[in-house]
Amino acid sequence: MTSSWPQLLELLLRGGELEDDQAAALMQAWLAEELEPVQTGAFLAALRCRNYRPVELAAMARVLRAASPLPCPRPALPLVDTCGTGGDGADSFNISTAVAFTAAACGVVVAKHGNRSASGKVGSADVLEGLGLQLQAPLQQVVGALEQAGITFLFAPGWHPALKSLAPLRKCLGVRTVFNLLGPLVNPLQPDAQVLGVATEDLLEPMAGALQLLGLKRAVVVYGHGGLDEASLSGTNQLMVLEDGQLRRDQLDPQALGLALQPIDALSGGDLARNQTILKAVLQGQGSQAQKDVVALNTALVLWSAGQVSSWREGVQQAHDCLASGKPWQRFEQLAAALTPVGG
């Protein structure tokens, strides 16, 4: 990279785009703590103030992935992730977490990458820990759970220690930055397929383009009706679909799949205790019809991404049958056992 940091900042402030090597160098400088906090804050603000670019996101994600080497060989299994950007402010229950266990119970091997909530709501890590999942299990044990339980949970801080130095600045800024978008792109197990929810429609194409550049085989990026960062039951959802290396726009209408329209507040979560209650009930085949329907709808996207079904409708039916059996909760119990400390 021949440009100086002020030159790159000026480029961004004029609405320009970083090239692959420039974006990678910026991320490497952040990780090495080479920039002053005021410079980092300026870059984060400049990136945020115009549309994110797929090339930038993919380049930064590659650097972060390289900084988080696996402690053991990756299992030779086709893996799917269900991590989204968060930030929709809808206070819905942990839909993507329920989807992960439902998809696993349908036979998809799921490597879910997640964290605690950064917004004061309840994140996937918060609710899973509350239900008894060990978040601090040795990394080899986390990877091994894929073959034991067909699903694992990668607690982001344990896999990306290099980001710890940036945490105080991100907290001080108090706004969402490019790092919120990179979270779903830096699963250390590098899944083959992914369903990724975004909280604003303008993120559909950048995130889908980044997944394409990162070499995923199949993926669905979804912007939910009403502003959810997952498929919603309140109306038609907007999708970007990656298949055979090509991107296309699509829509997902729950009514066309036989699901009743529901207001967004039918999916509300609440505090940690209520989120735990809802998640356990849904995984056991209970919960409200709206809760089960939205999990089935989003699970259908995962099943398609994994190549297990050929249509959204087929995926919804398979997910509903699985939920009714209570098998998703059995997957949770299997994962909890797989992550229990040896001798614990």
UniProtKB/Swiss-Prot annotation:
Reactions this protein catalyses: N-(5-phospho-beta-D-ribosyl)anthranilate + diphosphate = 5-phospho-alpha-D-ribose 1-diphosphate + anthranilate
Cofactor: Mg(2+)
MF-aspect GO terms: anthranilate phosphoribosyltransferase activity; magnesium ion binding
Residues that coordinate or bind Mg(2+) 2: 229-230
Positions of anthranilate 2 binding: 170
Chain residues that bind anthranilate 1: 84, 115
InterPro entries per the UniProt record, alphabetical: Anthranilate_Pribosyl_Tfrase, Glycosyl_Trfase_fam3, Glycosyl_Trfase_fam3_N_dom, Glycosyl_Trfase_fam3_N_dom_sf, Nuc_phospho_transferase
Pfam families in the record: Glycos_trans_3N, Glycos_transf_3
Binding site for Mg(2+) 1: 96, 230
GO cellular component, one term: cytosol
Pathway: Amino-acid biosynthesis; L-tryptophan biosynthesis; L-tryptophan from chorismate: step 2/5
GO-annotated biological processes: L-tryptophan biosynthetic process
Coiled coil regions, renumbered to chain: none
Amino acids binding 5-phospho-alpha-D-ribose 1-diphosphate: 84, 87-88, 92, 94-97, 112-120, 124
Cofactor note: Binds 2 magnesium ions per monomer.
Signal peptide: none
PANTHER family in alphabetical order: ANTHRANILATE PHOSPHORIBOSYLTRANSFERASE
Function field: Catalyzes the transfer of the phosphoribosyl group of 5-phosphorylribose-1-pyrophosphate (PRPP) to anthranilate to yield N-(5'-phosphoribosyl)-anthranilate (PRA).
Quaternary structure and interacting proteins, as annotated: Homodimer.
Protein name per Swiss-Prot or TrEMBL: Anthranilate phosphoribosyltransferase
